[in-house]
């Protein structure tokens, strides 16, 4: 079977949803913990059929179910007809570059969740994906772009936009802790680029510490590539963004999580650790724009901006005398976001 056909088979089998997941279900209570390494003395049996390869892909992707009681409670809430909001925070992959707003994994998995667990129009959708943005900007956007909609679930996708330095680690953990403090269920999604860049290692540390659900299409793709089941060009038309079929493949991994999470034994109410992994000093960070912070002096700046979704800031006027814009406020720490206009 060639690689393009393999991708089509993986997607078509995955879209069978619960019918496929119900056969040979591996979602027992042991999967609530991160999967353990196989014994070095035991030879791994390689998949043979297309169905076995698909299941192996899901097993690689499903890093951890975490504390399942959080997601199970949200699912029960949706099934009862109450309003449930599913949010997605990330970069251009989440935004839908290469696949479009309706073809991205976020919209596909929201649709699947709404159809599987919703009772009509009670499940709402928030896509807070923004091209080129890492978790350092994600924590600043979190309040405006996610929390304002009071979500019950928030997927976090920053593995290819983040580096591995401490400021990324602190920001990512700050996002996680802020969501947990507000009783929002985080789901960590790990991506990868053509040159195999992914910041998932430190993100997995955070996910394990907070006992969160983690889905790694990075691990799944590495497994398929290593076994010649598909190539990067089957998955993407550039260096980092899934193409239309790639988004369907990623969505199938998330759908598998939705299909199986109710079968994993719950562990009781979630309790957030008081300790931290890194130094999440940006917890509860807030982004101030022109409607909420007034400068004491504009200097060589003017009100308004036209950069991406940041349209309520200030723009530097290089025809002026180069005098600074001045603000007066109190804060534990602050970050100023400066973007080029061309």
Place the predicted regions along the sequence by residue.
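Conserved small/polar residues in nucleotide/adenosyl-binding loops
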Residues: 334-341
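Sec-dependent N-terminal signal peptides of Gram-positive bacterial secreted proteins and lipoproteins
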Residues: 6-24
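Glycan-recognition and processing domains
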Residues: 263-328
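Oxyanion-hole/transition-state-stabilizing segment in secreted/luminal serine hydrolases
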Residues: 87-89, 95, 99, 135-169
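Extracellular serine-dependent O-acyl
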Residues: 187-190, 198-235, 248-263
